[in-house]
Every structure is written in structure tokens, then in C-alpha cells.
């Protein structure tokens, strides 16, 4: 969106045909979403009598949430006990025990005894700087740090893009192209001099580690633009300022030095048992100092990762003795899996729920960076998922939907395979025709195999039973069921035009409305007795029998019959 970038783009225009495959893939994605959605939503809504929104990506995402909820509910927490000895300046832990008595026995044998260092192992380790943000990783970080939803982050980033302060939002790349190195270097140097959290950086920025044109498809990573150097950030809305500052901090982290530390593991013998003490000594803060200062600036404490870090150990050597030691039992319980947050769910969507994918492996995910936020919002909007603070919890309706859906609709891995094939269409490794034939075949098979609701699932949607309409009567024209609607009583037969309107000219002239009871009597007996009918001619009311006089035309007619023994009211 910067003027210089636009001029640069026009100076290096590429033939439109180079993007034909990208267009084909986008068309396939839209077509597949429509074809699966319109068929599966109508199919399962009709089968179970309640609106059930089904989507090619939405349903597998919901299935991830339902599976996690089942794991949490089915988890049985068990206690554990860890014997520990306290030496001068540090604590060492023994092997975890299932029984408290066993841990207490170990502690009794160690209390007041001598602990001797058997081995000391030291390793120098490094944590490489993080990669730049793509949309999904930025959404995850904003949810983790600020609590923003994925849609809020996208909206803030889109606003920054339109103000020329950030690059294109909807990207799945975490790298820049080689021709951006000069611009990126100038930007990093400006950020180092003007952002408080950047002033700690002293080494030459390593722009090379964030540039790799082969890993950039249609758009590069999200970074600030040069416009940030001419903008007073204090005038930005809070959400936009938060996102832009975070993007700037990530650019500084990604181009800074590695974080290096020495990890120490010491094994001690005491009372015939082994105990282990672990510690960590920072040798070079590197990029983590930028992160620390950034969080300090936003008045945020330590991250969960920092809370779990081992403290530094005193200098230890083999055969070193500590006497006397005190021993105690640390009690704990096993924890269930955590509920998904938007941060962790977006991560799961990237890999279709497969954890621990190695760097560089093809990620067969659910949806695209541009669509994931909207999918999460729709799951909440249709009542399948609810937000409880940062947690995403499937509702009973959402859980029941996943229960009735077949695997080929709700399986994250199968859906991810389709997404992978779309990537192949983009690269010219698969044809759009083959992809759409597969989607059409799956949709056809889905409808053919699910013609009736499964008996075991019929009670899952009680709102369908409570909301199910009862027939008012039988249609005199076609024999179909006549159902009550908002404005009248209508035959369910699609080709039959029979209708009794609640407010029609006949009853309006007599200042009456056609009630459900009256309509039922007309359909069953062809007649209904009514009192208090108004006469336009005399201005008086009277009683009469209303007769159904249907000749098969567009409108149903009525006529009156007067009982011989009843007089008219005055």
C-alpha cells in the first residue's frame, strides 16, 4: 500500500497467466465449500428436524473441539508424590511415586543424611530467533498476549494495512523476498533507535535469516511499512497500536542474535536413592531481551514458558558433599488436556490436529489464514461453540452435530487432504477438474447413504421435537397435511395451493380471525359454528355456521348457513 511499493509493483508487472492456477484453486475452494455446505446442511437439517450448519472446514474444526472436550471429561486425575531433598542453595528431586508412603519412606532414609554429587553435566544450548509473523501466528500471539479473537486481530491488521502502516494481512508466509533486504534493514535500524524495546539490540541485524523467496508464495510475511517512521503511534486506536507494536517487536526479535544458555544437570546420591537437580544460566540474552523489554513495556509479567524455566544452580562439582539435607514430599495431581483457546485451536487447524510436525514439513491444515477467523466466528454465531474467557467450549448442540456426522465430513485429516490437493492445484500438480469431481462424488455419496436418521441419534435434538408442528387437518384437495404458519394454514404439498388465511376478506368483514380450532373444524367437518359475526349492513352481530366452499381456485371461499332455531343477536 505504500506509494513506493505500488510503483515498484507496476514497474515489474508479471503476465496474468502466471496466476491462472492460483485462480483455479480459489475457484475450487469456493465451489467445494458451497457444494458440501448446501448439500450437507440441508441433508442433516431435514433428517433431524433442526437447522444444522455443516461446512467442509467448519465441521472438522468443531470436531477438534468436541474431541478435546471428551478427553477432558473422560480424564481421571491421579495423585503423585515426589521426594525432594534441600541442599544448600538448591533442591533436587527423586523419582515420582504413585504412593505417598513410598515417597515418605525415601524421605525418611534421607532426612539429616549426606548427599553427594555423582555427576555434573553441562551443555551450551541456543534458541534461535522466531520467524516473522504470518496471519495465523500473529492471531495466535494476539490471543495469547492481549486476549483478542482471531477476527479482532484480522480487523486491526486490515485497518493498519489500509492506513499503509502494515503489509498485506492474509499471508501464510513467514519470510521476505530477497529484494526487500534493503528496506527491511532500514526499518530494523529505525525501530532499534525509536522503540524502547529495541534499544537493547547492539549486533548487526541478520536480515538474511528472514529472507527466502522460495518460501514466499503470493504474499510475504507481515511487517511494518516505512510509513511507521512518519506516524505518531499514540493517535492509533488501542487495538491497532497493540498489533502494530507486536509486529514491530517480532521483526526486531527475528533479526537479532540467538539466545544462548548453559543447561546444568546434576545427579546426587542420598539415602540409597538418586536425585536430580536442573539449572539454567543465561550466557547471552539475544532476542529474548527484546521480548522481555516489550512485555515489560506493556506491564505484562513472565510468560508460561519463563515460569517453567529452571533456576540457576550454584557451582557444583563431582563428589561434592552436602550435609545435613532436609527431605520432604511434594504432592501433585496429573492434569487433563487444556481446553482450546483461539491460540491453540488456530495451531491445531494449521496441522489438522497433528502435533509436533517438523520444520519444513508440508502442513495439511484446515482452511486458510484468510478464512480461519471467520470459521471460528461462525461456530460461535450458530450456537455450536461458546467463549468462556479465552476458552472455546463446544455446546451440547455442537457436540450432538459431531456425533451424527459421518467421518468423511468431520475428519480433520480427510479435510486436510482436500486442502493439500488445492495446494497441488496452485502448483499445477493436480487439475481443478479432478478436485471438483472428488468433491462432487463425496457430496453425492453423502446424500445417497443418509436417507433416514439413525434411530440411536433421534433423541439428540429435543428442540426439533418441541418445535415440530402438528398438522391442523387434512387438505381437501390433495390429502396432504395442512400446517399452521404465521399468516395462515397451508398444505405441505409443494404443488398444492390450498391455504386458509388467518386474515382474509370474508372474516375481516365480519371482524373475526380464523383460529386454529376453527380451521381444524373446517378441514375435518367442512363447517364450524361461530358466534359474534358482525353485519356490515345492520351493524349488529349474529351467530351462524361457516361452511367451507372450496372450488379449487386460487382462493378458498366460504358461505354462511343459519341454524333454524337460533335467532340473531341485537
Question: What is each stretch, according to the model?
Answer:
Residues 377, 403, 420, 424, ...:
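Amphipathic alpha-helical coiled-coil/heptad-repeat segments
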Residues 372-439:
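Internal insertion modules embedded within essential enzymes
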Residues 1-350, 357-366, 370-384, 389-391, ...:
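Toprim catalytic domain recognition across nucleic-acid enzymes
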Residues 9, 141, 156, 348, ...:
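Generic alpha-helical secondary-structure signal
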Residues 47-50, 448-570:
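Functional cation/ligand-contacting sites centered on basic and imidazole/sulfhydryl donors
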Amino acid at each position: 500500500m505504500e506509494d513506493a511499493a505500488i510503483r515498484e509493483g507496476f514497474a515489474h508487472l508479471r503476465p496474468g497467466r502466471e496466476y491462472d492456477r492460483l485462480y483455479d484453486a480459489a475457484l475450487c475452494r469456493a465451489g467445494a465449500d458451497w457444494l458440501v455446505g448446501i448439500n450437507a446442511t440441508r441433508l442433516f437439517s431435514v433428517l433431524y428436524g433442526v437447522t444444522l450448519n455443516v461446512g467442509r472446514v467448519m465441521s472438522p474444526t468443531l470436531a477438534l473441539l468436541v474431541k478435546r472436550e471428551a478427553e477432558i471429561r473422560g480424564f481421571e486425575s491421579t495423585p503423585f508424590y515426589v521426594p525432594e531433598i534441600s541442599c544448600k542453595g538448591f533442591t533436587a528431586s527423586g523419582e515420582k511415586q504413585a504412593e505417598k508412603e513410598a515417597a515418605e519412606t525415601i524421605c525418611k532414609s534421607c532426612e539429616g543424611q549426606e548427599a553427594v554429587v555423582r555427576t555434573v553435566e553441562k551443555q551450551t544450548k541456543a534458541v534461535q530467533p522466531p520467524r516473522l509473523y504470518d496471519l495465523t501466528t500473529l492471531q495466535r500471539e494476539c490471543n495469547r498476549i492481549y486476549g483478542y479473537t482471531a477476527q479482532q486481530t484480522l480487523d486491526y491488521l486490515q485497518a493498519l494495512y489500509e492506513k499503509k502502516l502494515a503489509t498485506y494481512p492474509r499471508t501464510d508466509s513467514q519470510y521476505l523476498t530477497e529484494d526487500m533486504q534493503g528496506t527491511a534493514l532500514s526499518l530494523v535500524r529505525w525501530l532499534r533507535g525509536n522503540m524502547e524495546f529495541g534499544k537493547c539490540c547492539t549486533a548487526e541485524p541478520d536480515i538474511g535469516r528472514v529472507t527466502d523467496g522460495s518460501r514466499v508464495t503470493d504474499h510475504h510475511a507481515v511487517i511494518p511499512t516505512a510509513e511507521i517512521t512518519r506516524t505518531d503511534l499514540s493517535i492509533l486506536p488501542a487495538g491497532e497500536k497493540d498489533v502494530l507494536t507486536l509486529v514491530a517487536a517480532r521483526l526486531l526479535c527475528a533479526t537479532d542474535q540467538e539466545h544462548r544458555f548453559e543447561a546444568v544437570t546434576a545427579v546426587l546420591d542420598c539415602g540409597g536413592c538418586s536425585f536430580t537437580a536442573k539449572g539454567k544460566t543465561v550466557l547471552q540474552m539475544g532476542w529474548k531481551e527484546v521480548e522481555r523489554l516489550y512485555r515489560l513495556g506493556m506491564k505484562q509479567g513472565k510468560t508460561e514458558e519463563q515460569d517453567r524455566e529452571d533456576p540457576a544452580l550454584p557451582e557444583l562439582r563431582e563428589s561434592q558433599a552436602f550435609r545435613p539435607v532436609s527431605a520432604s514430599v511434594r504432592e501433585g495431581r496429573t492434569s487433563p488436556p487444556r481446553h482450546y483457546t483461539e491460540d491453540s485451536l488456530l495451531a491445531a487447524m494449521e496441522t489438522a490436529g497433528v502435533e509436533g510436525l517438523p520444520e519444513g514439513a508440508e502442513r495439511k491444515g484446515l482452511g486458510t489464514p484468510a478464512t480461519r477467523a471467520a470459521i471460528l466466528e461462525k461456530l460461535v454465531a450458530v450456537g455450536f461453540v461458546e467463549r468462556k474467557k479465552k476458552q472455546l467450549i463446544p455446546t451440547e448442540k455442537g457436540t450432538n452435530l459431531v456425533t451424527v456426522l459421518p467421518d468423511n465430513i468431520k475428519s480433520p485429516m480427510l479435510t486436510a487432504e482436500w486442502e493439500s490437493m488445492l495446494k497441488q492445484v496452485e502448483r499445477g500438480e493436480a487439475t481443478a477438474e479432478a478436485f471438483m469431481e472428488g468433491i462432487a462424488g463425496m457430496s453425492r455419496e453423502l446424500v445417497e447413504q443418509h436417507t433416514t436418521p439413525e434411530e440411536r441419534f433421534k433423541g439428540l435434538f429435543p428442540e426439533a421435537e418441541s418445535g415440530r408442528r402438528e398438522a391442523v387437518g387434512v387438505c381437501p384437495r390433495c390429502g396432504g397435511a395442512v400446517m399452521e404458519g404465521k399468516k395462515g394454514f397451508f398444505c405441505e404439498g409443494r404443488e398444492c395451493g390450498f391455504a386458509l388465511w388467518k386474515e382474509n376478506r370474508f372474516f375481516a368483514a365480519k371482524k373475526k380471525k380464523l383460529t386454529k380450532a376453527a380451521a381444524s373444524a373446517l378441514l375435518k367437518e367442512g363447517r364450524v359454528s361461530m358466534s359474534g359475526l358482525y353485519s356490515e349492513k345492520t351493524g349488529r352481530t349474529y351467530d351462524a355456521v361457516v361452511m367451507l366452499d372450496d372450488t379449487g381456485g386460487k382462493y378458498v371461499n366460504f358461505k354462511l348457513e343459519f341454524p333454524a332455531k337460533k335467532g340473531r343477536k341485537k
